[in-house]
Amino acid sequence: MPIKVQRDLPARAILESENIFIMDEDRAMSQDIRPLEILILNLMPLKEDTETQLLRALSNTPLQVDCTFLMLSTHVSKNTSASHLNKFYVSFDSIKKKKFDGMIITGAPVENMEFEEVNYWEELSGIMEWTKTHVTSTIHICWGAQAGLYYHYGIPKYKRTEKLSGIYNHRVLDRKVPLVRSFNDTFLAPHSRYTEVRREDIEKHPELVILAESEEAGIFLVMSRDGKQIFVQGHPEYDRMTLNNEYHRDLNKGLNPSLPVNYYEDNDPFSVPELTWRNTSNTLYTNWLNFYVYQMTPYLLDDGEEELVHQQYHRLCNKYEKTFRHGKYSNAGRFLSFFTNSSETGSNLTLSHILSL
C-alpha cells in the first residue's frame, strides 16, 4: 500500500529502507484516486517510534492511505519536541468538521490512573464521541482500547498484581468474522500493560464480540458487531526491540521489572529477540482497512461534496440529455458510481475530475 506522508517526516526514511512504498503529496495527487483518509491520535510518549510502527502496519494492501496525525490541546508531550508536533500534527479543532474513513487511537502510559484523573480525559471523550458520526471505523490500542470500552460501554479496567509484558499465545474464537480472516488458529502478539479488561464484563454487552484471547494475557481483540469500534488490548504494531527498550528503561528507573515473557532467547536480556508477530499485525490492519474501512466507507466523506456531485449531474443532464436522463446513468447515484468506480472509465476519478466534466 502506498502511504502518503509529508516529505520530511522522520519515519519516511526508515520505512523506505524497508522497501515500503511512501509517497509525498505531489506523487499522491498524480495518481488521480481518492485515498483512504486515516486519522491517528498518537498518545504514546515516543511518538516518532509509534508513527513508524503504525505506518508500517498500514502499508500492506494496494490501497492508497493518507495519514493525518492528531495531537491533544490539553496535554503537553514530554518526550517529543514541540517543533515535530507543530510540523507533522494537527489539532482536533482544525479537523473536527471533516470526516475520516478510519481512525487509530493508541495506548498511553496512564493506565494506573482512573480514566477521569487523566488530564486530557475530557478532550479524549469528546473525540471518541465524535468518531460515532465522523469516522467509518476506529481501532483502539491497549490503554486506548480500555478507554474506548469504558467510554462507549462503561466497561471497567482492573489493576494487575504485576505488569504483563511479553509475547503471548492467543486463539481465534470466531473465524467467520472478516477482521480475523487469514489468522492462524493460534498466534503470537505482544502485551505491555498494568491493567486489563475482563471477559465477564464484555459479555454483558451483546453488541460486542470477543474475537481472540489468551489463557495467560486475557482478552486481545474485541469488536462492536457493526465494525465501527475495534479494541485491541495488546500491541501488535510493536517493533522487534520495543519490549526490550521498555524493559531496560524500567530497569534503569529502579523498578525491578520482570523479563518479558517468551521474548528473549534463553531469557538473556542482551540477546536480539526474534520477531514472531509481524504477520499477525500486518493481517489485522490489512483486514481492518479492507473489510471495515474501504468496503464500508462512502466515496464522498462530506455532505458538501455530495451536493456538488448532484449539481454537476443535473448540469450534465442538460448537456447530454439522452445519455444521462434515459440511459444507465439515470440518477445521480448511478452517475457517481460510474465515475468513481467503473472499469468503463479505465480508472477511478476524483471529485475534481467529476466537477470539471
PLM features: residue spans?
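Amide-donor transfer/coupling interface in amidating biosynthetic enzymes
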Residues: 1-74, 88-95, 99, 126, ...
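Conserved beta-strand hairpin/beta-sheet module of binuclear metal-dependent hydrolase folds
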Residues: 75-87, 96-102, 110-113
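Cysteine-nucleophile active-site neighborhood
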Residues: 100, 105-174
